[in-house]
Amino acid sequence: VIESHADARYSFGKFKKKHFGPSGSWEAQVCELPNLRHLRVFQAVARLGSISGASREARVSQPAVTQGIAKLEAMLDVVLFERRQSGCYLTEYGRAYLARTDRMFAEMEGGLVAPRVGPPFADDKSLKSILAKTTATHVRALMAVAEHRSIETAALKLGISASSLTRAARDLEGVLRRTLFHPGLQGLTPTKPATELARRFGLACRELTYATEEIATLKGMSTSRVVIGTLPLFPVDLIARSVDDVLRIYPGTRVLVVEGAYLSLLDDLRAGKIDFLVSVLRRPNWAEDVDEEPLFRDPYAIVARRGHPLSRCRNITLQDLARFEWVLPELGTPRRMAFEHMFAGFSPKPKTSIETRSIEFQRGMLSTSDRVSIVTRQETMLEERIGALAALPFAPPVSRNADGIATRANWRPTIVQLAFLDLLRRNSRDILSIPQSAVPSSDQRGQVTPRWPALPVTGPAKRRERALVGAMPRS
């Protein structure tokens, strides 16, 4: 792709087509970013309702405006405007694309004017000029370097020359009049403000990915991709049932479930690599750009192998449990903190020489020994169905945070994502033990439900949704 002004000096054709993951992956977000000038012209035509008005505002010829709109329509394979003698009017697809385009530029503007790290890159006076000079190639270059942590490593991973990537990165520095990269052990590496700006640019690109998915859904041929983050020990039944339900409504949907450590998943959520996080709610204070919605409370239980010596006891005490070795996750995790709280001031404390987050490894260590562990009630039910472990008759004297959904603040779900969230809420009622007043009702979930109404589901997808929801039991 060769864009206006500085882009005439270098091409990112290979960068775009060959070296990123499949469409819908986080890396592919940069590939789906069209010419930013075309997007700005599209906004102008939508706002002014005419080609001539947009031409005057953008200071380009009317044929250039027409060509820019035509390229967007060809890329999306839809008609964005109805052309009439009285002007240009957005179609249903055009309205969907405009909403996401507006959000994309708002995200970019926020990253430039109000970054979370370092001083602003722009103020109200310089913002318009900087946005006009920033190109899709600049965005791709910054995101690639931030992802791979150095220009040299990014160029090697992408199969392009370091000089081409360096020119794009340096040109962006000239546009912003800020140093974005500094020498490191692996060559030029991004500064912290540059890494944060790349994150905001990534979220901006994600809006256009959502736009293409919403347009496909409106056409009755959903190709949406839902990326869910979850912890290794989170109740799998809830997610599995919700995935199965959403695939019946939108058969073309691709669902990716990513397991990992909480803080790693939180970073992925904030960067737009995952759409939402389903886990125990434990947002740190610094993550002000993340919202949480409680769904249910899953209390702790103590598990051991079937036939464990304590399974025959009626009144188990902490002294009894302290005689056995424990298998636990590492320090700082909720279950480990619950264990530490249980045995606070207890001497001697139980032996804890084995640390793991792996369900399979924990099951193996417990099923072949007299070791014990602390898990949730839902995890206990799963282990009992498998037949490997059983709950001991002991109620841990510790409370547990609610489980629920974490999303980016001001996030606007796609049609399919919104359906998946509603299915999570519906299915979570089967294990709901939180007081109903503590769980937002459908009209109180401002943290997850978009501030704008979701685009209406029409055609075959709507009929499938009605059929499935009507068949579901209501609590």
What are these regions (language model features)?
Residues 2-5, 13-14, 133, 263-300, ...:
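Short beta-strand-centered segments that line the small-molecule binding cleft or hinge
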Residues 45-59, 145-157:
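Short helix-boundary/capping micro-motifs
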Residues 73-90, 173-190:
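A short LG(V/I)-centered, amphipathic sequence patch enriched
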Residues 115-138, 217-235, 250-253, 299:
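Interdomain hinge and pocket-entrance segments immediately C-terminal to HTH DNA-binding domains
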Residues 148, 153-163, 224-282, 475:
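Central regulatory/effector-binding core of bacterial HTH transcription factors
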Residues 220, 289-326, 409:
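Flexible hinge/capping segments at coil-to-helix
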Residues 261, 270-273, 280, 332, ...:
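Hydrophobic hinge/microswitch elements
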Residues 390-436, 440:
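A late-sequence structural motif
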